[in-house]
Amino acid sequence: MTEAQRHQILLEMLAQLGFVTVEKVVERLGISPATARRDINKLDESGKLKKVRNGAEAITQQRPRWTPMNLHQAQNHDEKVRIAKAASQLVNTGESVVINCGSTAFLLGREMCGKPVQIITNYLPLANYLIDQEHDSVIIMGGQYNKSQSITLSPQGSENSLYAGHWMFTSGKGLTAEGLYKTDMLTAMAEQKMLSVVGKLVVLVDSSKIGERAGMLFSRADQIDMLITGKNANPEILQQLEAQGVSILRV
């Protein structure tokens, strides 16, 4: 057995066990204790394992920074990035924003991370990211954890109405001249309670959702202050929304 073969087997043992003794290496490879120690020393020097007393440990790989999904594979990713960047530029220093769940919401939170603004969210993937990145001001809305959406939902009539931000950014499954539609009723109802206390409601949807009607009506068009969407959005729907006082930004 060559040295390279021994090293490969030793590393495979560590991958399975996490720790091996010199005695175990000798037994498995049929080599002398001196050869086993020499192999461990070489692999330690090359950074492939950690040498410890009477054996070796597997090196714990640093966990990659977590994101809720492979964002680059999200539908209409590039358009959503442009939408998030445009939305982040609306917020001034010292203001507070409410950001809800979804891929666009996460992209927006990532854009705003590190800026001198307060971010209020019930979306745990975003909250975890902001905390990991040491964003100065993060408020996590409390409640029962909803596994399917990775959010917290508080009981009806609870303190969520106290989370009044200058801005509320939200998305949905469809937007028509009637308003914004969401398919998850629990999350929609939880967010609806904040509509009366936020300063401005900004809807972030990619162009594929313009003209779509799915689920429940979350907010009427006349409740929406601004829509940020893609350049391919249905112009007829956009005109109807503008006629109802919605500011339109296409990116």
UniProtKB/Swiss-Prot annotation:
Transcription recorded as keyword: yes
Broad class of where this protein is predominantly found: cytoplasm
Entry GO MF terms: DNA binding; DNA-binding transcription factor activity
Highest rank taxon of the organism: Bacteria
SUPFAM superfamilies: NagB/RpiA/CoA transferase-like, Winged helix' DNA-binding domain
S-S bridge residues: none
A GO CC term attached to the entry: cytoplasm
Cross-referenced HAMAP family: HTH_type_UlaR
Function: Represses ulaG and the ulaABCDEF operon.
Protein name: HTH-type transcriptional regulator UlaR
